[in-house]
Amino acid sequence: MSTYGATIRWDRNGAEDFAKGRYSRAHEWAFDGGAIVRASASPDNVPPGTADEAGVDPEEAFIAAICSCHMLFFIDYARRGGFVVDTYCDEASGVLEKGSDNKVAVTRVTLRPKIAWSGERRPSQPEIDDLHHRAHEDCFIANSVKTEVTIQP
C-alpha cells in the first residue's frame, strides 16, 4: 500500500464580496516532490472574473491523471513486449454532464494517443489494442473512478 498527498492553498486576499460569491477561485496545489501547480475553478463553472484561466482546473487534472496513468502503463507494457516507444502524445478530453444519478460528473473521458515507434520490431494494430486494453485494466486511476474511459488510437 502507498499513501499520496497534496497540499491545496487558497487565500481570500481581502475579497470584500465574499458573501456574494465574488472571490477568486485561484489557488495552488503543492506536491511532496516540490512541484507547485497554479490551479483554479473552471471559468465555465463559476461567475465571470473569478477564475484564473491560466490555472489548471480540477476537471482538467482529473482527465490528465487518467491519461497519464494509462500512458505510463502502456509504455511499460510496450517495453516488456520488446517494442520501443519514441513519443506518446494524447489529446484527451472529458465530458462534464449530469450522470444517471442526476449529479454533475465527468462521465466520459476519451483518450486519443498518437504513438511513434522505432526499433526492429513494430507492434501490429491488434498488439497495440492489447497494450491499451492491459494498460486500461491496470491503471490505478481508471480503476478508482466510475467514469467511462474510451481509447481512440
Language-model features and meaning:
Residues 1-64, 73-153:
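Extended beta-strand/beta-hairpin segments
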